Amino acid sequence: MPASKEASEHQLTAIENGGIPMFTRIPAMPTANIWAKQFAQKTGAKYLPFGLKHEMVVAGGVRIFYDNFKDTDIETMWSVFSTGVLSRTLQIALPKTKFNAVAVARNIQEGELGRAKFYSHDRAFLKPSRIQTPFDSIQTYDAKGWELLKQHGQQGDWFWNVAGNMPKPTIKPSDIDSSREWGDFKDFEKHYKD
C-alpha cells in the first residue's frame, strides 16, 4: 500500500476486510508492480499486476462483455482510463463501438489506448470531479469521466461506471501507522522466507 501520513478510506476498508497492510513509499506504479512481483516470488504468493493486466483477465472479460452486449447496438462508450485493461477489453469485445478514454491518474503510454479517443482530466487524482453524477460513483475517479462525457459526448453515449462508493470503514486513520520513510520495507521483509 502506498505509504502516507494517514491511511486512505480505501486502505482502511481493505484492512478492515482482512487485508494485510504493507506500507512503503512508491515512486511510480511501474515500480510498485516490480516490487509486488518480487514480493510474490520471495514469499511464494501469486502475483496479480495492478489493474489486473493479465491475458486471462482480458480473455475472461472479452467473453463476458461479448456475451452480455452482443445483441446491443452501442455506438459510443466512455470510461475512465488508468491501466487501460477495462477499455482495451471492451474494445476487443465490441469491435463496432467507438470508445472514449478519460485518463484520471497517470500519463498514457504509446499503445495503451487501443482505438479509444483520448481525453485527460485536468484535476489531480485526489481532487473530486466538478460535477455530481446522477448515479453512485467515486468522485475522484469515474465522475471525472462522466464530467468529460457531459462536455464532449452525445445523447445516447454509454458510460461504464467502474465502481460506486463503499461503506465508510469503522477503523480510523489514527488506528493505523501508514507513514514510512523512503526505502523502508519492514512490512514486506517480515513476510520473506529465509
Residue ranges and their predicted role:
Residues 2-5, 26-28, 102-108, 163-164:
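Short, acidic/turn-prone active-site loops that include or flank metal/cofactor-
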Residues 14, 18, 96-153, 174-194:
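Active-site/ligand-binding loops adjacent to catalytic centers
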Residues 4-6, 54, 79-90, 141-144, ...:
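Gly/Ser/Thr-rich loops at beta-strand to alpha-helix junctions
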Residues 42-49, 73-80, 155-164:
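Short hydrophobic beta-strand segments
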Residues 70-112:
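Aromatic-anchored, glycine/proline-accented short structural segments
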Residues 59-60, 88-92, 171:
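A short secondary-structure junction signal
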Residues 64-68, 86-90, 142-152:
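Buried hydrophobic packing segments
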Residues 3-73, 115-127, 132-136:
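Small/polar-residue-rich loop-to-helix segments that shape phosphate-bearing ligand pockets
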